[in-house]
């Protein structure tokens, strides 16, 4: 996921001070320019019931890999990917949360700093769709009111086993102010990039112009260091988005 620095071996029999023939005669080796630093650092959290494919979506986007039998996430995990949108370089930190209820006290601490929230259900398992109101309560209780929301019906590759229609997903999203909806397949890599890039684009659209012009800004998009201990939970929000 994170790019690693390349390691160069010393030629056999050579020395650190040796000059290759190609560099003789006054020629100098050009130094490789360091990569441009990110203009913004931004956190996104993926939530949803166990087994809906949250980890698979994250790993497909960050590493372009897919695991048929991924182990359930314990607590939280994260990956980082740098993307470029609207002429800006964004370092995107994606938090993958456990779907089991016993981890809620841990994962809830990561909602507050998320500027985007991806809520995932499995189109082949009605119970994961029925759990969506529970996850919305978590969002309303812990997340920022300004967080962008995206509902994703995953496992579109299992169309023949579908239990939740696209219309049902769209109807649920329409009841939530500002929530977008799409269906995807981590296995077939369908709509995966679009999920994350559209979410980031929506976040950037809401940023003030003076913030967008300020490179390496310490604005509200700044990414905080990965906490070893979950941060203090924010107070409950004054109202909810849905019943």
Swiss-Prot record:
Gene Ontology annotations of biological process type: autophagy; cellular response to type II interferon; endosome to lysosome transport; positive regulation of macroautophagy; protein catabolic process; protein transport; Rab protein signal transduction
Residue list for modification N-acetylmethionine: 1
Recorded GO CC terms: autophagosome; Golgi membrane; lysosomal membrane; lysosome; phagocytic vesicle; recycling endosome membrane
Motif (Switch 1): 64-78
Lipid modification (S-geranylgeranyl cysteine), residues: 242-243
Chain segments carrying region Disordered: 1-36
Residues with Phosphoserine modification: 15, 20, 24, 105
Cellular compartments annotated: Recycling endosome membrane; Lysosome membrane; Golgi apparatus membrane; Cytoplasmic vesicle, Autophagosome
EC primary class: hydrolase
Chief subcellular location: membrane
Regulation: Regulated by guanine nucleotide exchange factors (GEFs) including DENND3 which promote the exchange of bound GDP for free GTP. Regulated by GTPase activating proteins (GAPs) which increase the GTP hydrolysis activity. Inhibited by GDP dissociation inhibitors (GDIs).
Record PTM text: Phosphorylation of Ser-105 in the switch II region by LRRK2 prevents the association of RAB regulatory proteins, including CHM, CHML and RAB GDP dissociation inhibitors GDI1 and GDI2.
Matches recorded under Pfam families: Ras (PF00071)
Residues bound to Mg(2+): 55, 73, 96
PANTHER family: LD44762P (PTHR47980)
Domains: entry comment: Switch 1, switch 2 and the interswitch regions are characteristic of Rab GTPases and mediate the interactions with Rab downstream effectors. The switch regions undergo conformational changes upon nucleotide binding which drives interaction with specific sets of effector proteins, with most effectors only binding to GTP-bound Rab.
Function: The small GTPases Rab are key regulators of intracellular membrane trafficking, from the formation of transport vesicles to their fusion with membranes. Rabs cycle between an inactive GDP-bound form and an active GTP-bound form that is able to recruit to membranes different set of downstream effectors directly responsible for vesicle formation, movement, tethering and fusion. RAB12 may play a role in protein transport from recycling endosomes to lysosomes regulating, for instance, the degradation of the transferrin receptor. Involved in autophagy.
Name of protein: Ras-related protein Rab-12
